């Protein structure tokens, strides 16, 4: 199958009376190929193989790649913790005041794991052509929250 025409796909999907599903799941694909979450979030080839395994096994109207809310934060300089079988998380606060915000530089596309996520997306789009491929990325407010460590303010704390 050649390149998918998204306008046609959207039109056909709207006109079709059948309910479609687009599961946003990647962990089962990681397990299917015998890899760890750490493998998938640090290696674009493994990431793609997990998505491909899901597409081969389960029907879905679209393929979704891993949306890792730490990729962009890492590219900006945040420290990331990588548990073997859990999603990565930001450790601590990168931004503490307005001066730190003003000093931020827009990261290059080769910073942190961005290149691996681009690789996973390119491989998925090139090889999974029977359905749309939906890439995930963090929004500006979520990114700001991770750089400023807003979890500090939203997590329960012990009472005195």
Each model region followed by its residue ranges:
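Short, flexible micro-motifs
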Residues: 37, 142, 160
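Short, structured secondary-structure boundary patches
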Residues: 84-89, 156
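Conserved small/polar residues in nucleotide/adenosyl-binding loops
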Residues: 153-160
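Residue-level preference for long, well-ordered alpha-helices that form the structural scaffold
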Residues: 40-47, 106-113, 155
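Glycine-rich, aromatic-flanked loop segments that form ligand/cofactor-binding clefts
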Residues: 16-25, 62-85, 112-151
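A gly/proline- and charged-residue-enriched helix-loop-helix capping module
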Residues: 87-123
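N-terminal basic, low-complexity leaders that serve as flexible interaction/assembly modules and, when applicable
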Residues: 1-84
